[in-house]
């Protein structure tokens, strides 16, 4: 039932001219959205839109949204949006102090009864954590509702594990998993012999934008609207990268409950485990906890009235 991996026929489409924008637009439903990416697919132009009140994203044909007609209109729309949760959070998690490790949101901004499960999928030569994902699906069937998770996915993991990735998409489609797709960079660089200040994405800061955009481009090629969140590889960053990340419209996600490091789960925690089979300790710890946790969608961590 769970693991007939036969989705390889679902091909990604070819995406071109994938680039960052930051445009307030009026969507089909007359609601204001923020376009954070534009791209071409089969000669048609698309936007990735963020709902600034819910952090939800969608893909929309550019011809179906209304753009500001001039600079003044654009500035007026942006002013209207300045008090929205998305803009407030974007500003909050791009300001000082800039710490090298675990910068960004590490737990819910508001008191909640529940936790947020974030699952990192760095590049890996191993198969994914089959029993763990199967347990999440079984839990969904038992509770008769989708299990909300944030999958922090690297582009290379998708490219090397396409069948497993498509299996995850299928569980979302079937209503078992409610997945927020978080960008985790394309190649997730890591060097065993380098200090942190010259490691992970700090090893080549000039390539940062490309690392972020390439991972997003892969997601939209599968018709997935990437969320406005980003997880730094190794949770390592600096002021330069944080400022660039803000320009890309992304909010950095850290963690206060990286299980393999012995950190404890509390209400509001962003739990961090690896679903790529590179850190078994975290999976061994989370498995017995799963039935007891009250998992919430990551977007709810930033919304006062939704909890």
Curated annotation (Swiss-Prot):
InterPro entries: Glyco_hydro/deAcase_b/a-brl
Protein source organism: Rickettsia conorii (strain ATCC VR-613 / Malish 7)
GO biological process, one term: carbohydrate metabolic process
Protein name, UniProt field: Uncharacterized protein RC0012
